[in-house]
Regions:
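Extreme N-terminal starter segment of soluble prokaryotic enzymes
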Residues: 1-5
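Glycine-rich phosphate/diphosphate-binding loop of Rossmann-like nucleotide-binding domains
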Residues: 6-23, 27-29, 157-210
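Short, ordered loop/turn segments at secondary-structure junctions
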Residues: 10-12, 43, 74, 114, ...
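Generic secondary-structure signature for well-ordered alpha-helical cores
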Residues: 26, 30-34, 65-68, 101-108, ...
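N-terminal beta-loop-helix "entrance" segment that forms/cooperates
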Residues: 33-57
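General small-molecule cofactor/ligand-binding pocket signal
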Residues: 37-41, 110, 191
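Short, active-site-adjacent cap segments at secondary-structure transitions
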Residues: 46, 77-78, 198-200
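N-terminal glycine-rich phosphate/adenylate-binding segment common to multiple enzyme folds
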Residues: 49-162
Length: 210
């Protein structure tokens, strides 16, 4: 099997951890007879330093034409880095939002596992831990607050910031389907978390998921 992997080392510890991850992939390729072809692109602060933008259109096209993306770390110290003196759409994290949108990466999967042998290291109560737990937490990535309209303005002499939380039923449905598909391979249980007692977006979320 031959696969093309776009490598984004990014900023901070990104280059260090991605280099080690590539070593692991190389061992996998060696053991199972695969071939991984790596193409490096810049994203985040390192791209700003070289090109003046957090992610170029050319880099996006390379990622689109690959089978997978290996991503390190994006951004730096928000208090000291000159990147954060730029307009919000030119800061490192804007590149991350752009590539998520362009590649349709709407579902963030975060496994949470605790094995019985590690229960003493967990801050949760014993009656919650039981014999350990194995959860998959899924977060929607390309809708909601991160992609809604935003503005900062002066209202009656008071500086006011507005972020718009927007979801449509298609965005909700696709991540719900992904959650159900994953659950069918696990314990066949899905818990949808919302704030339907307050938010219209959550009421729509609950309506679609249910």
């Amino acid at each position: 099997m031959e696969k093309k992997i776009t490598v984004i080392k990014g900023d901070g510890i990104g280059p260090e951890i991605v280099t080690e991850a590539q070593k692991v992939l190389d061992k996998v390729a060696e053991k199972f007879g695969h071939k991984f072809v790596y193409t490096d692109i810049l994203m985040g602060g390192c791209s700003i330093d070289k090109y003046g933008v957090p992610l170029t259109d050319e880099a996006v096209e390379i990622a689109k034409n690959s089978d997978a993306v290996l991503l390190g770390s994006i951004g730096g110290n928000t208090s000291t880095s000159p990147w954060y003196k730029l307009a919000p759409n030119l800061r490192p994290e804007a590149g991350l939002l752009k590539i998520r949108k362009e590649l349709g990466l709407f579902a963030n999967l975060r496994p949470a596992n605790l094995y019985p042998e590690l229960r003493e290291a967990c801050p949760l109560k014993d009656d919650i831990i039981g014999d350990g737990f194995d959860m998959m937490i899924m977060r929607e990535l390309t809708g909601g607050l991160y992609f809604g309209a935003r503005k900062t303005e002066n209202v009656d002499g008071v500086e006011t910031a507005v972020d718009t939380l927007t979801y449509n039923e298609n965005e909700i449905r696709r991540i719900a389907i992904r959650g159900f598909d994953i659950a069918m391979k696990r314990r066949k249980k899905v818990t949808s978390v919302d704030k339907a007692n307050v938010l219209d977006s959550s009421r729509l979320w609950r309506k679609v998921v249910n």
